[in-house]
Amino acid sequence: MFEIKTVALFVLTAIAEIVGCYLPYLWLRQGASIWLLVPAALALGIFVWLLSLHPEAAGRVYAAYGGAYVAVALAWLWVVDGIKPTNWDFVGVAVTLAGMGIILFAPRA
């Protein structure tokens, strides 16, 4: 159960970070309203708060979180941007998720 909660927390954290970065991108690159910076700042604040909820040491959390971030970013590419990932993208996600699993589930001394 701990692992499921941890992975779910990683996914929520990644979504908050991606939203917090995507909204300014829309403003800067696609001419969207500057008011998107308000929800972007809120999303990044939520991102930082969610990072603080992770039970492990910060360095380990950031390392393991990277795997979830890559997976969520690829899903974002497909769902939001409408670009289907390549087979190599999926291989890369599998490798990063394997690394995340090793970091999360390795025995601790």
Curated annotation (Swiss-Prot):
GO terms for cellular component: plasma membrane. The keyword Transmembrane helix applies. It is a multi-pass membrane protein. The chain crosses the membrane at residues 7-27, 31-51, 63-83, 87-107. It is found in: Cell inner membrane. The keyword Transmembrane helix applies. Keywords: Cell inner membrane, Cell membrane, Membrane, Transmembrane, Transmembrane helix. Belongs to the UPF0060 family. This is UPF0060 membrane protein mma_0129. It comes from Janthinobacterium sp. (strain Marseille). The lineage of its organism: Bacteria, Pseudomonadati, Pseudomonadota, Betaproteobacteria, Burkholderiales.
